[in-house]
């Protein structure tokens, strides 16, 4: 606990959305900006109030310039489980740390924030008046104050059982707000070019933050689709590149996915999406390519690989190959004329993730991150099913439920070891290999569950 004694304490007000993704995002961003995650709290769970120890206010501000999981951050001056405990805590806070924000030439206002309860205006004023013992010497300015102070009260998580008194009360100086507005400004609904599986804007930014994407990075998406993940990375100043096996998607051709629109327009493509947000300068290129047969020379090119592989549900899992599928087929492929159109074959999920991890291990710089979605059949899921590679360390594993029996997990891995040729076969010796192959039947299990649910609904309506 020595860390919390030497560092300033801050209060994070978290959004109550994507709860499992919040802690890995904050840890990744603190690491990115040179901070170390430290807290006096034993658990965070679903609570929106987190007390953190952060080295400096600059790091706290940088954190809020990136996070979409946190709403605001405050310099914590005091907290307690009752008003009396709060006031006692405030009286013990060093006066020399308060004075720069309370002097006579300053302006301020005090806000009351409650979680899971609404207070009347009279109750709010009563709480503000109770803070008169603090040495405020400045003038109140409700419109444009220099400093904003907040009283935050936590009434628990159960909306059906709201206590009379709060569980915890906090008081602090507001530092900055997070980037929650990006979720709306980059909404897929407003985007020029979209597809059936375009990634939600909020999740795209979370993935970029988990991947520690930063300015001047080179970020690659091997299953780029309509480029939603590239947009989030480009927003943070990274140069983006992608590939996809679907010619029509890469070139913006074919049928449109929007309602009341039959065909895609001539300017519906990934580059146009980046142009829409003023990010075209970060566009490197997007190519038609097969992820199972990378066309890259050996070397480390990418600072991060951020991707959402197809699961075989709304987008098919495909790769190029020969109908005969014999080892010599690769040699024949190399001799084929340029006009040859390759056969499209099914791409097993276990093979897809094996190829993805090998590719990441070979092309990521040391310390670079791989962030991808792993679909799972919930009743059979175990941690052993998460793909493993000797060059990659698992950083986080977060679940997003899709249905009662399926979910997808956001896997973040970091390259910690230089790639060697023998590493691409290490999975065969791992205890994880057999459970890992269970991903191949995800599509069948998914639709099996859908069929059972439809039959159950039809039966209930008939009754």
From Swiss-Prot:
**PANTHER family, sorted:** RNA METHYLASE-RELATED, TRNA (GUANINE(10)-N2)-METHYLTRANSFERASE HOMOLOG
Where does the record place it? Cytoplasm
Task: Enumerate the InterPro entries for this protein.
Answer: DNA_methylase_N6_adenine_CS (IPR002052), RlmKL-like_Mtase (IPR000241), SAM-dependent_MTases_sf (IPR029063), tRNA_mtfrase_TRM11 (IPR016691)
Main localization of the protein? Answer: cytoplasm
What species does this protein belong to?
A: Pongo abelii (Sumatran orangutan)
- CDD domains, sorted: AdoMet_MTases
Assembly notes: Part of the heterodimeric TRMT11-TRM112 methyltransferase complex; this complex forms an active tRNA methyltransferase, where TRMT112 acts as an activator of the catalytic subunit TRMT11.
Signal peptide (residue range)? none
What one GO molecular function would you report for this record?
tRNA binding
Where, per the database record, does this protein carry N-acetylalanine?
2
Q: What is this protein called?
A: tRNA (guanine(10)-N(2))-methyltransferase TRMT11
């Amino acid at each position: 606990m020595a860390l919390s004694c030497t560092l300033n304490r801050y209060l994070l007000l978290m959004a109550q959305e994507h709860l499992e993704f919040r802690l890995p995002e904050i840890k990744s961003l603190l690491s990115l900006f040179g901070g170390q995650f430290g807290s006096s709290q034993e658990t965070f769970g679903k609570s929106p109030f987190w007390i953190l120890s952060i080295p400096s206010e600059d790091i706290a501000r940088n954190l809020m310039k990136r996070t979409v999981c946190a709403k605001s951050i405050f310099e914590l001056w005091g907290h307690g489980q009752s008003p009396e405990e709060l006031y006692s805590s405030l009286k013990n806070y060093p006066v020399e740390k308060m004075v720069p924000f309370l002097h006579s030439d300053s302006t301020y206002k005090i806000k009351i924030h409650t979680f899971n309860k609404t207070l009347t205006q009279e109750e709010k004023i009563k709480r503000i008046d109770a803070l008169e013992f603090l040495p405020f010497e400045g003038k109140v300015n409700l419109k444009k104050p220099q400093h904003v102070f907040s009283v935050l009260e936590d009434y628990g998580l159960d909306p059906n059982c709201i206590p009379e008194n709060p569980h915890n009360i906090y008081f602090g100086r507001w530092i900055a707000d997070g980037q929650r507005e990006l979720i709306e400004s980059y909404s897929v609904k407003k985007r020029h070019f979209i597809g059936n599986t375009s990634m939600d804007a909020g999740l795209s930014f979370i993935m970029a933050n988990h991947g520690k994407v930063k300015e001047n990075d080179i970020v690659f998406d091997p299953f780029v689709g309509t480029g939603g993940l590239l947009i989030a990375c480009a927003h943070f100043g990274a140069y983006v590149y992608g590939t996809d096996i679907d010619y029509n998607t890469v070139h913006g051709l074919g049928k449109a996915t929007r309602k009341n629109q039959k065909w895609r327009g001539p300017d519906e493509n990934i580059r146009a999406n980046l142009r829409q947000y003023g990010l075209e300068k970060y566009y490197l290129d997007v190519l038609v390519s097969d992820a199972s047969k990378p066309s890259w020379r050996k070397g480390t090119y990418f600072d991060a690989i951020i991707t959402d592989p197809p699961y075989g549900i709304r987008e098919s899992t495909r790769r190029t190959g020969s109908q005969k599928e014999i080892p010599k087929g690769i040699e024949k492929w190399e001799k084929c004329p340029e006009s040859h159109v390759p056969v499209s074959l099914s791409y097993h999920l276990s093979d897809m993730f094996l190829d993805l991890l090998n590719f990441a291990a070979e092309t990521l710089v040391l310390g670079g991150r791989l962030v991808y979605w792993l679909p799972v059949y919930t009743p059979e899921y175990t941690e052993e099913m998460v793909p493993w590679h000797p060059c990659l360390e698992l950083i986080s594993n977060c679940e997003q439920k899709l249905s009662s029996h399926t979910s997808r997990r956001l896997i973040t891995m970091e390259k910690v070891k230089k790639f060697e040729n023998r590493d691409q076969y290490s999975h065969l010796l791992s205890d994880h290999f057999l459970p890992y192959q269970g991903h191949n039947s995800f599509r069948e299990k998914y639709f099996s569950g859908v069929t059972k649910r439809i039959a159950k609904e039809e039966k209930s309506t008939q009754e």
